[in-house]
Amino acid sequence: MGKQQETILIIGAGISGLATSRLLTNNGIPNIVFEASTPDRSQGFAISLQEFGYSTLLAALGDLPLSSLIRAVAPDRQIGGTGWIDQALRDNRTGELLVAPDLTTTKQTIVRANRNALRHWIADCGEDELDVRYGHKLQSIKGKLGDVTAIFENGAKYKGSLIIAADGVNSTSRSQILPDVVPETIPLIHYHGEFQLSHSAFDELIRPHSGHSNILVGVGDSFNTPLSICNITKTRVHLDWSYSRTVKGENDILYRPNVQSEEAKQIPPALLEELDALNLAEPWKTILNSESLKTHRVFHWTTRCVYITQDDARRAGEQGVIFVGDSWHAMPIFGGEGGNHALLDGVELADAIAASTASSGNGDWDSVIKNYYGGAWKRSQEAVRRSTQRFFLLHRPATEWKEISEQKKKPA
């Protein structure tokens, strides 16, 4: 029982939970990861890893080379790609290049990563296998720091010294401990679609516009239409698209922030009518239309942000819960930094726990919480505000995009 008391319980097997678990395991610190979903649940869309995120993780994993990460997670890894993106913005009604960095002097600092592949790679970066228990949906939390119990809907109960809440923007852990902290809904329409093309169709339709970039970003008049490669196999190219725009008044029929999960998978007729009326350039025109969407998996996404005060973090810590990832700093996906800060959370929290364990032989949990939040709170909460501001800037009117493009063309 004593050994079980010392175990750290991690709720959620996303990238923040797995990164924390992997680093704790590599340091010989017992932990268990609990995941509500089944092992075959896909998180196959891609995210952008920035240098500040992946370099910190690689160092914590024993100074692994960047090439080991790229070979494992880049969406185009099977054809020798590096997850490169051109960071360009194009007018999705003309195809005109609006904004692009000077690629002759810019080294690759952003790595596009397939989320599923990233999770598997993190889990495999060590000699000892991670203890991940699937089918465990958290029901409640009882106890205090140093002696806390997680109770699951399947009837299982586990005691531990600390619960690490890595269960996302709609965190059950957070709602149990901090019920007054409610995610803030961003007033934006956001639909996400997944589809596949043969290599030949991809080379004909998208490659002439994207080149070797893993993202083709189209911006319009207060709306965006990015196309992203999720994964390339020997025969198929798996892609996704997003359509996002600002809300048009109080009665916008497509603004459904409280839509239920099953209804979120249904395509509203108003969306099809709206896409058909956009007058898009290729390749968006061929992909984003009412006929093409019949073969796509389409989801309504509600964009939410989470802010937690330092006092919130302290109160949760007293009850034995500490946060990583979207559970305490959810931010917009497009233009956001969430995945990178999730990795930093895992590294910094594991470091704090390992340092405390090394000095005392057992965790000084009050010091762990103080040391972790001492740096992570300001870093992550500033990132939420920064990402939210950037998200709205990426949905600016077409006239502003044109002005920016003209300014970029002027000689320095």
From Swiss-Prot:
Q: Which cofactor does it need?
A: FAD
Q: What is its EC number?
A: 1.-.-.-
Q: Which superkingdom is the protein from?
A: Eukaryota
Q: Which UniProt keywords apply?
A: FAD, Flavoprotein, Glycoprotein, Monooxygenase, Oxidoreductase, Signal
* Signal sequence range: 1-21
* Biochemical pathway: Secondary metabolite biosynthesis
What residues are glycosylation sites in this protein? 92, 170, 231
Q: Does the keyword Kinase apply?
A: no
| Gene Ontology molecular function, alphabetical | FAD binding; monooxygenase activity
**Which InterPro entries does the UniProt entry name for this protein?**
FAD-bd (IPR002938), FAD/NAD-bd_sf (IPR036188)
Q: Where does FAD bind?
A: 35, 46, 119, 326, 339
State the family it belongs to.
Belongs to the paxM FAD-dependent monooxygenase family.
| Function noted in UniProt | FAD-dependent monooxygenase; part of the gene cluster that mediates the biosynthesis of neosartoricin B, a prenylated anthracenone that probably exhibits T-cell antiproliferative activity, suggestive of a physiological role as an immunosuppressive agent. The non-reducing polyketide synthase nscA probably synthesizes and cyclizes the decaketide backbone. The hydrolase nscB then mediates the product release through hydrolysis followed by spontaneous decarboxylation. The prenyltransferase nscD catalyzes the addition of the dimethylallyl group to the aromatic C5.
Protein name according to UniProt: FAD-dependent monooxygenase nscC
